[in-house]
């Protein structure tokens, strides 16, 4: 790693910014490792989740039927947008009472977590290095990744949550017997010879939906964050070209990234609604 | 060791390049169809727009998952011996 003597090389800088602050102190070796907990992702997702719930609660508590303020205006806009989408997809009003607020929370939560990507790359990690060094640690090992949705374990965790919700609604709407019957007869019809194929198709469908749902958000945010890091490398060359390149390329990518952030949060919300809606219709 | 890194770099480039071909063609076709439809029926423009953005995200999904994995190969290289 970067010893005190010289500044980090380009790849050390990138790898340093890609390493999570986890309970093992170094990067995660193998792909699946249940013992590793990414403390920074947990911290940022929980804090931003609490902020989301607080914002929506404050808007709801201060809602007046009179002239709405800007804050209430934007929350109303969001609620109407999510309600319209939910009405179009989830047809049972009774389960919509739970699913629409869930979709709204998911949208605002993921949007705010994604928006952390717009902060300068070194802002929070450098503050954390100071705190870490003050606490007696070696600053070169003070890792921090600010964007929780650029962490595969976080996004797959969210999509697994959506999967569990779908299983719950499948059982609630169709009953365990109805759902198990559907599992074995769904795509190709009710013939004993087709049972294994039907069951395999259903399992593949559930797994594919969950993995693509989580990986899509991860892929977009990870690529976006990495491009911000690479642009920051441009600035670290401390040349006039490098500095202006960093400022121009960084602002262009940040402006485009605002669209990606909103779009990915919208897509995650829409797919949550679509998957729960699918759990209602029988095949 | 150099061979591994060389092939990893090639793999990352191929993943991103081929993924980009698919995503761009898909969005190009969808965009042209969307413009055609909104030209033919302007009142449907808004409804189609939200669906177009949703589909644009879905089309980009495979490409950006590939880009995510290719960049993971490039920087946090799991193939180092």
Swiss-Prot record, chain B:
The keyword Protein biosynthesis does not apply. It holds the Pfam family ATP-synt_C. The keyword Transport applies. It comes from the Bacteria. PROSITE patterns: ATPASE_C (PS00605). The chain crosses the membrane at residues 7-27, 53-73. GO terms for molecular function: lipid binding; proton-transporting ATP synthase activity, rotational mechanism. Keywords: ATP synthesis, Cell inner membrane, Cell membrane, CF(0), Hydrogen ion transport, Ion transport, Lipid-binding, Membrane, Transmembrane, Transmembrane helix, Transport. The record marks 60 as: Reversibly protonated during proton transport. It is found in: Cell inner membrane. F-type ATPases have 2 components, F(1) - the catalytic core - and F(0) - the membrane proton channel. F(1) has five subunits: alpha(3), beta(3), gamma(1), delta(1), epsilon(1). F(0) has three main subunits: a(1), b(2) and c(10-14). The alpha and beta chains form an alternating ring which encloses part of the gamma chain. F(1) is attached to F(0) by a central stalk formed by the gamma and epsilon chains, while a peripheral stalk is formed by the delta and b chains. Belongs to the ATPase C chain family. HAMAP family: ATP_synth_c_bact. This is ATP synthase subunit c. It comes from Azoarcus sp. (strain BH72). The gene is atpE.
């Amino acid at each position: 790693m970067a010893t005190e003597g010289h500044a980090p090389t380009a790849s050390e800088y990138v790898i340093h910014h890609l390493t999570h602050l986890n309970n093992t102190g170094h990067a995660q070796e193998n792909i699946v490792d249940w013992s590793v907990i990414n403390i920074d992702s947990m911290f940022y997702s929980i804090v931003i989740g609490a902020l989301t719930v607080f914002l929506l609660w404050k808007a709801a508590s201060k809602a007046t039927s009179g002239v709405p303020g800007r804050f209430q205006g934007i929350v109303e806009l969001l609620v109407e947008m999510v309600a319209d989408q939910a009405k179009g997809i989830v047809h049972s009003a009774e389960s919509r009472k739970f699913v629409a607020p869930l979709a709204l929370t998911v949208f605002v939560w993921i949007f705010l977590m994604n928006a952390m990507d717009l902060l300068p790359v070194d802002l929070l990690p450098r503050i954390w290095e100071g705190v870490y060094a003050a606490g007696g640690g070696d600053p070169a090992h003070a890792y921090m990744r600010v964007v929780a949705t650029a962490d595969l374990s976080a996004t797959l965790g969210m999509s697994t949550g959506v999967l569990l919700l779908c299983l719950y609604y499948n059982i609630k709407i169709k009953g365990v017997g109805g759902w198990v019957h559907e599992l074995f007869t769904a795509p190709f019809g009710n013939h004993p010879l087709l049972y294994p194929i039907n069951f395999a198709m259903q399992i593949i469908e559930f797994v594919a939906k969950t993995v693509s749902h989580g990986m899509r958000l991860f892929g977009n945010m990870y690529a976006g964050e990495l491009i911000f890091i690479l642009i920051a490398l441009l600035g670290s060359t401390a040349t006039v070209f490098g500095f202006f390149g960093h400022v121009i390329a960084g602002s262009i990518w940040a402006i485009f990234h605002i669209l990606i952030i909103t779009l990915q949060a919208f897509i995650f919300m829409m797919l949550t609604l679509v998957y729960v809606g699918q759990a209602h219709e029988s095949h | 060791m150099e061979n591994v890194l060389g092939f990893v770099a090639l793999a990352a480039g191929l993943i991103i390049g081929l993924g980009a071909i698919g995503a761009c063609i898909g969005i190009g076709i969808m965009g042209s169809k969307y413009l055609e439809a909104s030209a033919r029926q302007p009142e449907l423009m808004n409804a189609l727009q939200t669906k177009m953005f949703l589909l644009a995200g879905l089309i980009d999904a495979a490409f950006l998952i590939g880009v995510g994995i290719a960049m993971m190969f490039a920087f946090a290289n799991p193939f180092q011996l």
